[in-house]
């Protein structure tokens, strides 16, 4: 039996109302995609072309106007479809009073990871993203690039089968961008 697609999008449309009497905005029109397990897939397009909206629909963060999205064969609108997904949004928000290690640990606990293995996982991930030396610094003192790296670590914390990254190298210096590409 074939494995379900990691991500499948069928005839996706998403429109947004912009105000009373104003025209609707067609963010996504008739997109079909089938991403198999193990594939790396990128979306390229100008600002405002619907890339982030498509990702949010795939993750069930916005409801499609028409069409459907699924993750490993489950509707993306079902809460359990996110159990095997790591997500780095375009502009992640983190609690500035937490340290890097506390932040990654926080997301690991949200994913149901237990304390002892989580502590080692946090150490490994901070090493992977090049922030082991900044693990005990508060995020309020991190640069934009460092915050993106923490975002990558939190997206990887539960060892997801599907990783969705929205502009993962935004604000990261060229060497950091290369490092993130190598992680991907």
State the predicted function of each range.
Residues 41-46:
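The feature captures the beta-strand-to-loop junction immediately N-terminal to the Walker
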């Amino acid at each position: 039996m074939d494995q379900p697609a990691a991500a499948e999008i069928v005839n996706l449309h998403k429109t947004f109302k912009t105000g009373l009497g104003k025209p609707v905005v067609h963010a996504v029109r008739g997109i079909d995609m089938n991403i198999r397990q193990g594939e790396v897939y990128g979306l390229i397009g100008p600002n405002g072309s619907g890339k982030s909206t498509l990702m949010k629909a795939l993750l069930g963060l916005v409801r499609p106007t028409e069409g459907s999205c699924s993750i490993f064969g489950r509707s993306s609108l079902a809460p359990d479809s996110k159990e095997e997904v790591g997500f780095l949004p375009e502009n992640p928000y983190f609690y500035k009073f937490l340290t890097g290690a506390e932040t990654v640990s926080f997301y690991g606990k949200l994913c149901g990871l237990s304390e002892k293995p989580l502590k080692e996982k946090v150490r490994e991930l901070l090493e992977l993203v090049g922030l082991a030396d900044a693990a005990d610094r508060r995020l309020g003192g991190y640069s934009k690039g460092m915050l993106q790296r923490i975002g990558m670590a939190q997206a990887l914390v539960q060892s997801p089968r599907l990783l969705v990254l929205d502009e993962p190298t935004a604000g990261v210096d060229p060497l950091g961008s290369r490092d993130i590409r190598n992680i991907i």
